[in-house]
């Protein structure tokens, strides 16, 4: 296959209609987008790198300093070359990898017209030049059509939505989607009308099953274009600003892996104690992380993404609340590092165990725990036992680190079930209540194992999170029904519905490269253009989670006030109910 790059439309044309709206703090982004080739890549790398470093630094003035006249971002822009088309060196392609864009597009070394062009190219047949004139005309039509569609998606999902919202405006996503849908229809009509069966001669049939119709193959191609453009815009443009409790906190975050085993229970093979491999995110110090690389998550040896945490660095002194997080069915302990690292940056210790026999790594190895529904809550109680033991063990890393009276639990999907089980009464599988857990935050939980009266037995503060288009644990049966049967009386008894969120919106699955997602599954439950942008959704989850645990475990009245229905009504894409 030969790669034909879609060139000729500079990124400046994408953002020019909203240039005035991007004045001030957004000007650096605009300048990067208007700069072509290697220089544009370097510019955006400097922009993203400087801002992200600031947002993870304890100095609150860092970001304003790098944005100031003559600051680091102005220096980056001063180094950019004139916008000319040039070949992309391997290093340029790697810059896109630094931006974590490699999973969003077909990466190309052949040419750089501007950095947005690097996000999309199409593999045409090697012998395209030998084809009939109608196939060549079709190829030119396809290039023009998908370029226009891509630019529409980036414009509508980027400057017109995220930047306006970030600057206090409103993003009309229905209008955005309508514009994209209209351009998609025009592209579809042009390709089908001017190509016909010549489309298949371009070598694009691999994008759709062989048995599909021509219309389905064209639709698949256009879906790829929309997906790449939408996710590119999410990466470049920041989501809505919900205030400091949605932002990274004052503590740099450390992470370490604890290799634990529960001798009172057997592993899935019955050959030894049950392993409880656990990732722990904790508050660190600026001195401890200086010069240290950020932690990189790897699965099967494949580097997935860089995290905001630093491995095995020193812990900040003092006692902190403990929050346990239970992953979903077939998930893994670091599936929601965005959530764990956020809480840790605000002064929580967050322990996220692997549930042995119920991770996707275990599944690949043929390790299955048929009793996972009962073992999961026992894993969580075992972890509490361990941390309380660490607390009084001289010389242990977590000695005097956890406040035993401030313990909360959260979990996603099957982990949401686990959270319910820890704070409710008995049900068909038994009773797993752990009175040490003082607050519960189930995320897109599975509630089907529980009868209605089970939820009336929950007396601790609880905030249930769910997505309106969750196809795995649908909202009415798994989030609304539990909430409807909860009794009022606790400090917080709430239900937060994220409009447009899917099941895996509450995880970091959209950070995973697509080729691995096809193995894991989940793309269609979080990462499609129809979904609430996952970075904005994560901001909402972090805002709700931090204020909930701050209000309940730390007794913070300001945090409790932020969770009132009146205040939460101002958050776009959130529907909140309370008892």
Model-flagged regions — what are they?
Residues 21-239:
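Soluble, non-transmembrane alpha-helical interaction regions
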Residues 388, 416-431:
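Short glycine-enriched nucleophile-adjacent loop
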Residues 345, 369-404, 409, 421:
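Alpha/beta-hydrolase active-site loop
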Residues 327, 411-417:
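Conserved alpha/beta-hydrolase "nucleophile elbow" surrounding the catalytic nucleophile
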Residues 287-288, 305-363, 471-476:
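Short substrate-entry loop that stabilizes the transition state in hydrolases
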Residues 240-324, 335, 527-534:
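Domain-level recognition of soluble alpha/beta enzyme cores
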């Amino acid at each position: 296959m030969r790669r034909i790059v879609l060139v000729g439309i500079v990124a400046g044309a994408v953002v020019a209609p909203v240039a005035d709206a991007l004045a001030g703090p957004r000007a650096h982004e605009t300048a990067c987008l208007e700069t072509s080739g290697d220089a544009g890549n370097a510019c955006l790398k400097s922009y993203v790198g400087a801002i992200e470093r600031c947002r993870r630094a304890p100095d609150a003035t860092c970001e304003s300093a790098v944005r100031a006249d003559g600051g680091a971002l102005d220096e980056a822009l001063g180094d950019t070359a004139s916008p000319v088309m040039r070949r992309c060196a391997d290093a340029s392609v790697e810059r896109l990898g630094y931006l974590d864009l490699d999973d969003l597009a077909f990466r190309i070394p052949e040419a750089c017209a501007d950095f947005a062009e690097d996000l999309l190219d199409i593999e045409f047949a090697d012998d395209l030049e030998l084809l009939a004139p109608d196939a060549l005309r079709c190829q030119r039509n396809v290039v023009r059509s998908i370029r226009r569609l891509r630019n529409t998606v980036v414009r509508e999902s980027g400057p017109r939505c995220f930047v306006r919202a970030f600057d206090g405006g409103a993003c009309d996503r229905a209008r955005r989607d309508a514009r994209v849908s209209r351009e998609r229809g025009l592209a579809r009509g042009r390709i089908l009308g001017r190509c016909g069966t010549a489309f298949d001669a371009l070598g694009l049939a691999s994008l759709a099953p062989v048995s599909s119709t021509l219309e389905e193959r064209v639709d698949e191609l256009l879906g790829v274009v929309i997906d790449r453009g939408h996710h590119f815009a999410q990466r470049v443009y920041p989501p809505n600003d919900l205030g400091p409790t949605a932002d990274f906190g004052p503590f740099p975050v450390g992470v370490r892996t604890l290799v634990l085993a529960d001798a009172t229970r057997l592993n899935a093979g019955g050959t030894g104690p049950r392993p409880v491999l656990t990732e722990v995110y904790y508050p660190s110090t600026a001195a401890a992380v200086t010069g240290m690389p950020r932690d990189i998550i790897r699965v099967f040896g494949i580097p997935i993404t860089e995290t905001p945490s630093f491995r095995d660095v020193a812990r900040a002194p003092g006692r902190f609340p403990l929050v346990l997080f239970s992953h979903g069915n077939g998930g893994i302990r670091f599936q929601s590092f965005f959530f764990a690292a956020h809480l840790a940056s605000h002064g929580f210790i967050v322990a996220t165990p692997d549930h042995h026999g119920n991770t996707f790594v275990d599944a690949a190895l043929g390790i299955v725990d048929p009793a996972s529904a009962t073992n999961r809550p026992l894993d969580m109680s075992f972890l509490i036992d361990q941390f309380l033991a660490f607390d009084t063990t001289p010389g242990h890393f977590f000695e005097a680190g956890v406040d035993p009276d401030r313990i909360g639990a959260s979990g996603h999907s099957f982990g949401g079930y686990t959270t319910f089980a820890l704070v409710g009464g008995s049900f068909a599988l038994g009773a797993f209540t752990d009175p040490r857990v003082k607050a519960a935050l189930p995320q897109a939980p599975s509630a089907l194992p529980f009868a209605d009266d089970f939820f009336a037995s929950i007396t601790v503060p609880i905030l249930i999170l769910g997505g309106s288009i969750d196809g795995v644990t649908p909202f009415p049966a798994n989030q609304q029904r539990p909430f409807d049967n909860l009794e009022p009386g606790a400090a917080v008894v709430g239900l937060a519905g994220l409009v447009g969120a899917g099941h895996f919106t509450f995880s970091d699955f959209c950070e995973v490269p697509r080729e691995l997602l096809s193995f894991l599954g989940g793309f269609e439950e979080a990462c499609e253009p129809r979904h609430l942008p996952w970075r904005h959704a994560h901001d909402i989850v972090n805002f709700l989670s931090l204020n909930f645990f701050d209000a309940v475990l730390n007794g913070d009245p300001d945090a409790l006030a932020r969770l009132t229905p009146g205040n939460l009504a101002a958050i776009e894409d959130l529907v909140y109910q309370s008892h």
